[in-house]
Design a protein with these regions (language model features):
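Local cysteine-cluster metal-coordination motifs and their immediate loop/turn environment
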Residues: 10-21
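Short amphipathic alpha-helical interaction segments
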Residues: 328-342
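Immediate flanking context of iron-sulfur cluster ligation sites
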Residues: 1-9
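Short, amphipathic alpha-helical interaction segments positioned at domain boundaries
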Residues: 360-373
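A short, conserved structural fragment
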Residues: 342-352
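C-terminal scaffold of the Radical SAM
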Residues: 2, 20, 24-44, 49-328
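Short, Lys/Arg-rich nucleic-acid/phosphate-binding segment
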Residues: 234, 351-355
Length: 373
């Protein structure tokens, strides 16, 4: 069985006010110790054949590029010859030398966090870069030889207008990228931005306007040759993200690093959120103390998750795929839920057996998921 690997790099120059991921802007003194612990954790794992590697954060590009080569010395013997290897980078934390070292290590895909082309909106969400920094990063990446480049953009930012989204799309479409992710700003519990909303110091974008931004972005991207293959993701032909496809298809994945999650043999596990505990436990050969089993999925859990994750995909899923995996009829297992969603025009059934979200279902996806939780 082929595995997918996630590696978490938790360091950031500053914590964005909307970010709920495990990241630290005040612990740079622990970088070397963290990577030493990370090497040990990866080295003791049963890696199997690796289909994809995703290095996320945090801001992986904020640390020296030399820290990554030892990781790939460990992974390289297990990498599939067509493995997709992604690293997230942020403009303002990257230079040509880092990109060259990434390429030499074997990284073949980069994901750049732009979010918006408008400086006022970047400041609103705590980003430390400008659009010009992003454009320079893309140019450098192409000079070094990267051909698989994703950019993340965000909609629903406070004070954002449809004209801001138009400007962002105009600019990034001119750069000939291969993958674009369009995310709605989500106000996660415990973040500074959520507190500002709760305290009345910040206004959310009207939901109807945010949805208009989404459909505008979808149309523009599809008109420019991008395939809309998942709710938030658009790719040029042959450039769909293998790592994410694996996760959405319930493939197993191994997570390394602080706060990293794993999915193995129907168990969902997660490493400690404490950077110091993570390092100390590994240095004391107490790897098990870092790991918490969050869920042992039953067959019912697996079937529900199958439907939720597959409906995230624009192609949906065939009833026969469900039967092949679980030896059950999805229409019988979820008779009430599917009947209700069909009646409410949130999903539709195609003549070839596919179940998919409707346009209305795309806008109300959380209601669809709620039927299976």
């Amino acid at each position: 069985m082929k595995n997918h690997i996630y590696i978490h790099i938790p360091f950031c120059e500053s914590k964005c006010p909307y970010c709920a991921f495990g990241s630290f802007s005040d612990k740079f003194g622990l970088i070397a110790r963290y990577f030493d612990a990370l090497y040990k954790e990866i080295n003791r794992a049963n890696l199997g054949e690796i289909s994809s590697v995703f290095i996320g954060g945090g801001t992986p590009s904020v640390v020296k590029a030399d820290f990554y080569e030892p990781i790939f010395e460990i992974l390289r013997p297990n990498l599939d010859k067509n493995a997709e290897i992604t690293i997230e980078i942020n403009p303002g934390t990257i230079n040509k030398s880092k990109l060259e070292k990434y390429k030499e290590a074997g990284i073949n895909r980069i994901s750049i966090g732009l979010q918006s082309s408008k400086i006022n909106l970047l400041k609103e969400i705590g980003r430390i870069h400008t659009y010009e920094d992003f454009e320079d990063t893309v140019k450098l990446a192409k000079e070094v030889g990267f051909t698989n480049i994703n950019v993340d953009i965000m909609i629903g930012i406070p004070n954002q207008t449809i004209y801001d989204v138009e400007d962002t799309l105009d600019k990034i479409l001119a750069l000939d990228l291969t993958h674009i992710s369009v995310y709605s700003l989500i106000y996660e519990d415990g973040t500074l931005m959520t507190k500002m909303i709760d305290d009345g110091n910040l206004d959310e974008v009207d939901e109807e306007i945010e949805r208009y931004m989404y459909w505008y972005a979808k149309r523009r991207l599809e008109d420019n040759g991008f395939i809309h293959y998942e709710i938030s993701n658009f790719a040029k032909p042959s450039y769909r993200c293998k790592h994410n496809l694996g996760c959405w298809s319930q493939k197993e994945y191994l997570g390394f690093g602080v706060a990293a999650a794993s999915y193995i043999d129907n168990f969902r596990m997660k490493n400690t959120d404490s950077l110091e505990k993570y390092i100390n436990n590994i240095n004391n050969d107490k790897f098990y103390k870092n790991l918490t089993i969050e869920e042992k999925q039953t067959i019912d859990d697996q079937m529900k998750e199958f439907v939720i994750l597959r409906l995230r995909m624009m192609e949906g899923f065939r009833a026969s795929d469900f039967t092949a995996k679980f030896n059950k009829d999805v229409y019988k297992v979820f008779e009430n839920q599917i009947g209700k969603l069909l009646e409410e025009d949130l999903i539709f059934a195609e003549e070839f057996g596919y179940l998919r979200l409707t346009k209305k279902g795309l806008d109300l996806a959380n209601i669809v998921w709620g039927e299976f939780i």
